[in-house]
């Protein structure tokens, strides 16, 4: 039987939105057996640009794209949707402190959480791309009390994909050879790209890449700082790679994970690995028959434990900051 999905995308006229929508409409997230409605949300000044994007979507004549809704009203955008991809966020500007960014985005994501809570379909799932995505997700989740907490996710797949790419380059192998590359914690420069548990052609990555100095002192900082490096080189933040990672994430959350692999996504912690219950923290996950679960039996060496502590401390600080602002 043919399947149908209604998907809301916020910040739909932005760079990531532009890189995302055409691939969503062509079936790359939900499969070639699923038709799609797109509910596109933008701020009022961006609606003319969004109408141009809609014209282009129409001009692609995608067989799977059924209907499009264009709006600046979150209640309309989230009406009856099965997936809400929260891409739009206020960018960090020069001289802005992280807490200023948390406050500005906090009000956006609190409002969107409420609108999703009141208007979305009963099976809605929420995937946050807009940064700081872990804490934006936390805010949306806490403003949508009727939606189960296990339906909220934030994106660390871009970090995972970046890490896979770098390990493949260093080892001189094709990308599919690299598996089980885990990102722990926050999508920020404190994240822990865990090469210790990655595999290359079925062997531990540390056996294939013997250069421990590179792994510790080049690989980890490169992944942690990759977003900033892209901005410096391109003059704009990662857009196509972020959209690609969002599609990868949705696919992984829906489809059964291959037996020899896992994927990273930030979700609501339930005490795994000593992470506070209710924090949005990136873990290694698997999907089996549509059920997403955290892999819990991974052991960390002293280095890994320290890295987990650093990223957990940052997420606690962000939570405390938005709590003090009354956003959760």
Swiss-Prot record:
Its EC number is 1.1.1.37. The keyword Mitochondrion does not apply. Signal peptide: none annotated. GO terms for biological process: malate metabolic process; tricarboxylic acid cycle. It catalyses: (S)-malate + NAD(+) = oxaloacetate + NADH + H(+). Belongs to the LDH/MDH superfamily. MDH type 2 family. This is Malate dehydrogenase.
């Amino acid at each position: 039987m043919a399947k149908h999905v209604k998907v809301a995308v916020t910040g739909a006229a932005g760079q990531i939105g532009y890189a995302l929508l055409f691939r969503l409409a062509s079936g790359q997230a939900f499969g070639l057996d699923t038709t799609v409605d797109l509910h596109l949300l933008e701020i009022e000044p961006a609606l003319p640009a969004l109408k141009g994007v809609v014209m282009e979507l129409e001009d692609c004549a995608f067989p799977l794209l059924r209907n499009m809704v264009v709006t600046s009203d979150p209640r309309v955008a989230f009406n009856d949707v099965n997936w809400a991809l929260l891409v739009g966020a206020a960018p960090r500007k020069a001289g802005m402190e992280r807490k200023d960014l948390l406050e500005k985005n906090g009000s956006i994501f609190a409002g969107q959480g409420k609108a999703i809570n009141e208007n979305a379909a009963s099976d809605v799932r929420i995937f946050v791309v807009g940064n700081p995505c872990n804490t934006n997700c936390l805010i949306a989740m806490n403003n949508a009390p009727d939606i189960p907490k296990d339906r909220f996710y934030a994106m660390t797949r871009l970090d995972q994909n970046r890490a896979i790419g770098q390990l493949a380059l260093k080892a001189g192998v094709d990308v599919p050879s690299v598996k089980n590359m885990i990102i722990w914690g926050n999508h920020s420069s404190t994240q822990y790209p865990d090469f210790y548990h990655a595999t290359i052609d079925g062997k531990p990555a540390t056996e294939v890449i013997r250069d421990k100095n590179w792994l510790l002192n080049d690989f980890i900082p490169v992944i942690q700082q990759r977003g900033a490096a892209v901005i410096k080189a391109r003059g704009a933040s990662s857009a196509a790679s972020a959209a690609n990672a969002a599609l990868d994430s949705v696919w992984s959350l829906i489809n059964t994970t291959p037996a020899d692999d896992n994927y990273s996504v930030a979700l609501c912690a339930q005490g795994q690995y000593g992470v506070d219950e209710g924090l949005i923290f990136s873990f290694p996950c698997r999907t089996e028959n549509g059920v997403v679960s955290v892999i819990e039996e991974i052991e960390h060496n002293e280095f890994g434990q320290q890295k987990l502590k650093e990223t957990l401390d940052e997420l606690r600080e962000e939570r405390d900051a938005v709590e003090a602002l009354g956003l959760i």
